A protein has these predicted regions:
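Histidine- and aromatic-enriched segments that form or immediately flank copper-ligand environments
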Residues: 29-155, 233-262, 282-298, 369-513, ...
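Acidic-aromatic/histidine active-site loop/patch
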Residues: 158-231, 319, 334-338, 356, ...
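Low-complexity, Pro/Ser/Thr- and charge-rich linker/hinge segments at domain boundaries
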Residues: 148-162, 310-325, 544-553
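Cleavable N-terminal signal peptides of Sec/SRP-targeted secreted and luminal proteins
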Residues: 3-23
Length: 560
């Protein structure tokens, strides 16, 4: 999880075995991922979990901008598997994107599939994770893209780097927890702990040896690559006694700013610089949920340790002052500070003219379910449509013109306007269901406004768009006003990312240019909401040029 810069070292699991560093030139990077079940002990209890190469979290992928990456995944577990390379744009190459039944059929037990893609025009911290069922609870890892040789960071060079993956842990088998929730029609049980690099930390029982620690030297600067791999929780993260300087989110450089804590939603990444400038000692790094919706409070705090060199382990650490779990003011203020670097080398190419305006409401609902506990089951929807997963991958159906798999009639707006963020609505909560997606013209510019609603309850939702980055041009609390709110947009240096939070009882506006043909998933990155149907997809048409259409599928394309 750590590297020294320059001359960094790392673990590289490839076809060629253990390699010690990244070659300076662009290269082909080969990895072998074996999906294996392994017994792991946490919180005084052992259980079998699904892993990559027997590791939890899984191995970090290290590449340089411009490299070609080939990752062969062999499934030895009892579950079907697919791996998503979260934030990789996969230009024209949705075959390597990974979400099951969207761009590929899953890898069945005993089978293999090779993800073969180029890392073009991207550098920074991304990650990979399972994209089927809830298996990403334990099947995930970092994906670090170093700049091209000779290209420095646009911030002070750190002495050393560490990846921190924030996650969740359940005592029970996660898939059994989900199955129980599905059978009752109610939310499944919350996780029993949060983790830092798979370890809950000493605030949990039987966790003294399950505590992640990093060692620092006084006067030196460190880069933390922080990834929220949790399934269902936005998280605050802070280090006792130390400020952090945010320099990148979702593998895009930002204008640096100092903060005592960060807010990071599932799917997002944040790079921060930390100066070891405090009295030498041991300091807790801590993460706990941000939950401002009127729901059950999850107040479990994961802790790791930042330890100065030479300080004994008997030295008692101090805890950081994290924002309160419902500190919406901090959350809104923090997100407003995120701005693109917008320099000649790293411009913010914000679409100023919009060809297609989309307005999607985000909400919950209830449909009839005679076998469920209360005769109903909870659902989630966009524009009152709960997405139904197909039995054939959407990209295959699109490419091979297979009829009857999906409909391209997803509405640009909700069927009935209402007071989206007024008093909670508890009647007429039925939702339509279907595999309905939206067709987007190649190279058109799109503005999408995501509006939270009061259907059952308001709640924050982190949305991830596959195949693209987008600019977050506006956000606000209450109902989006299409006349007044666009005048307040930031069209100069808005933050660019691949996953954005829709605030509780509010809205977020994003813009992107649809220049990547294929079928691209759009979904809430809270796994619970995704499983309830809070998802859809864009099918972006081919362009007129020879290099503007979906690439042919790989020879090992999997059947469903």
């Amino acid at each position: 999880m750590a590297r020294v810069v320059p001359g960094f070292t790392f673990l590289f699991f490839g076809f060629l075995g253990l390699i010690s560093n990244i070659p300076a030139e662009a290269a082909i990077k080969n990895y072998q991922f074996d999906i294996q079940v392994k017994n792991v002990s946490r919180l005084c209890h052992a259980k079998p979990i699904v892993t990559v190469n027997g590791r939890f979290p899984g191995p970090t992928i290290y590449v340089r901008e411009g490299d070609r990456v080939r990752i062969n995944v062999t499934n030895h577990a009892q579950y079907n598997m697919s791996i998503h390379w979260h934030g990789l744009k996969q230009y024209r190459n949705g075959w390597a994107d990974g979400p099951a039944y969207i761009t590929q059929c899953p890898i069945q037990t005993g089978n293999s599939y090779t993800y073969d893609f180029n890392v073009t025009g991207q550098r920074g911290t991304l990650w990979w994770h399972a994209h089927i069922l809830w298996l990403r609870a334990t099947v995930h890892g970092a994906f670090v893209i170093m700049p091209k040789p000779g290209t420095p960071f646009p911030f002070p060079q750190p002495h050393q780097e560490f990846e921190l993956l924030l996650g969740e842990w359940w005592h029970a088998d996660v898939e059994e927890v989900v199955k129980q929730g599905t059978n009752t029609g109610l939310p499944p049980n919350m996780s029993d702990a949060h983790t830092i690099n798979g370890k809950p930390g000493p605030l949990f029982p039987c966790s003294e040896k399950h505590t992640f620690a990093i060692e620092v030297e006084s006067g030196k600067t460190y880069l933390l690559r922080i990834i929220n791999a949790a399934l269902n929780d936005e998280l605050f993260f802070a280090i006792a006694g130390h400020n952090m300087t945010v320099v990148e989110v979702d593998a895009v450089y930002t204008k640096p700013f100092s903060t005592q804590a960060i807010l990071i939603a599932p799917g997002q990444t944040t790079n921060v610089l930390v100066q070891a400038n405090q009295v030498p000692g041991r300091y807790f790094m801590a993460a706990r949920p941000y939950m401002d919706a009127p729901l059950s409070i999850d107040n479990k705090t994961a802790a790791g340790i930042l330890q100065y060199k030479g300080i004994p382990n008997t030295f008692l650490p101090t805890l950081p002052q994290l924002p309160a779990p419902n500190d919406t003011e901090f959350a809104l203020s923090y997100n407003k500070k995120l701005r693109s670097l917008n320099t000649p080398r790293y411009p913010a190419n914000v679409p100023l003219k919009v060809d297609r305006n989309l307005f999607y409401t985000v909400g919950f609902g209830k449909n009839s379910c005679p076998t469920c506990l209360n005769g109903t089951k909870l659902l989630a929807s966009l524009n009152n449509i709960s997405f139904v997963m197909p039995q054939v991958a959407l990209l295959q159906a699109h490419y091979f013109n297979v009829k009857g798999v999906y409909r391209v009639d997803f509405p640009d707006r909700p069927p009935i306007p209402f007071n989206y963020t007024g008093a909670p609505l508890t009647a007429n909560l039925g939702t339509a269901i279907g595999t309905r997606i939206s067709k987007i013209a190649f190279n058109s510019t799109v503005e999408l406004v995501l509006q939270d609603t009061n259907l059952l309850t308001v709640e924050s939702h982190p949305f991830h768009l596959h195949g693209y980055n987008f600019f977050v041009v506006g956000t606000g609390i209450g109902n989006f006003d299409p006349v007044k709110d666009p005048a307040k947009y930031n069209l100069v240096d808005p933050v660019e990312r691949n996953t954005v939070g829709v605030p509780t009882g509010g809205w977020t506006a994003i813009r992107f240019r649809a220049d990547n043909p294929g079928v691209w998933f759009l979904h809430c990155h809270l796994e619970l909401h995704t499983s309830w149907g809070l998802k859809t997809a864009f099918v972006v048409e081919d362009g007129p040029g020879a290099d503007q259409s979906v690439l042919p599928p790989p020879k090992d394309l999997l059947p469903c």
